[in-house]
């Protein structure tokens, strides 16, 4: 009996383990069909299959629809063959590797809601997405590749937010890359969670602090302590570094916003730095650290520059 499995999405932090699992599982189950996907294999799928003869195919780019198409293909064999399926690189029975064209970006409102059975997610952080893509072009970031910025329908978003609120989920972490890049979208979501606050659920957002306008700031000021928390990417305060990585951040504005939100006393702020960026030596990084630390965020997170496929 043949089985179709989709292994864990491949990221820089797990690729080595996924590759080893693929090798080992093929030894004990040689008839199994293995597909992998994710950012670490999407951009060089042919090389991945050359390196991993145990893997039958790579899903490149957005995988929701591609994975469904693969399941239909292996289940009934009546769907179009792999040669007509977009968004994949696959190995034919002859061993030849074929790379198909990329799939068009998805309508985000058609992505299924996966949290209907909350028992499966007990004691886990809920990750939720209302937009995909990013309007910026930071050269170290995978999100800058996807220029097609899309938003989930707001009526659908409200319905799903209410589901989380009704179930008293402890935390919902939005994975939107720059949540406040569209003012009306951000305000609608923030107003909704404020008006329907259950006194328990916390919502985490990644925002560009220098894009927060007066209306947004005044709304944030009125929120229950702990209703939202904000993650703000600074990465560096070195102007040469900021220019080199094509980042548009204005640190003076970021600092002003962070201090003002601090004065509200109701929002946990989480600021990020990256070590290893261009033009950033030990002394320069120390200054970036001091600049951010002086803002007194509740959390300062330090990441290290990683070479990401596709970036």
Residue positions per predicted region:
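Catalytic cores of alpha/beta
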Residues: 45-51, 216-220, 278-294
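Flexible glycine/acidic-rich beta-alpha junction loops that bind and position SAM and/or redox cofactors
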Residues: 183-184, 234, 240-245, 275-283, ...
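Short, solvent-exposed loop/turn segments at secondary-structure junctions
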Residues: 11-15, 40-42, 63-66, 104-107, ...
């Amino acid at each position: 009996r043949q089985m179709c499995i989709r292994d864990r999405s491949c990221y820089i932090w797990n690729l080595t383990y996924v590759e080893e699992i693929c090798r080992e599982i093929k030894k004990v189950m040689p008839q199994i069909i293995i597909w992998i996907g994710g950012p670490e294999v999407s951009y060089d799928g042919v090389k991945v299959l050359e390196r991993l003869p145990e893997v039958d195919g790579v899903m490149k780019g957005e995988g929701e629809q591609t994975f469904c198409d693969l399941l239909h293909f292996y289940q009934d064999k009546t769907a179009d063959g792999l040669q007509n399926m977009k968004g994949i690189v696959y190995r034919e029975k002859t061993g030849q590797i074929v790379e198909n064209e990329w799939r068009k970006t998805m309508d985000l409102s058609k992505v299924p809601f996966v949290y209907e059975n909350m028992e499966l997610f007990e004691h886990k952080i809920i990750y939720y997405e209302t937009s995909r893509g990013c309007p910026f072009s930071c050269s170290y970031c995978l999100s800058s590749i996807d220029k097609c910025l899309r938003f989930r329908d707001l009526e659908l978003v409200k319905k799903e937010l209410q589901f989380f609120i009704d179930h008293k989920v402890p935390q919902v972490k939005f994975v939107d890359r720059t949540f406040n890049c569209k003012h009306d979208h951000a305000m609608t979501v923030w107003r909704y969670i404020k008006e329907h606050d259950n006194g328990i659920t916390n919502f985490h957002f990644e925002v560009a602090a220098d894009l927060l306008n007066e209306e947004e700031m005044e709304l944030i000021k009125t929120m229950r302590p702990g209703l939202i928390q904000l993650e703000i990417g600074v990465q560096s305060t070195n102007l040469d570094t900021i220019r080199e990585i094509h980042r548009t951040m204005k640190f003076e504005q970021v600092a002003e916003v962070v201090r003002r939100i601090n004065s509200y006393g109701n929002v946990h702020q989480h600021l990020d730095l990256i070590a290893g960026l261009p033009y950033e030596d030990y002394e320069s990084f120390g200054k970036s650290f001091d600049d951010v630390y002086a803002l007194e965020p509740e959390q300062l997170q330090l990441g290290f520059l990683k070479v990401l496929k596709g970036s």
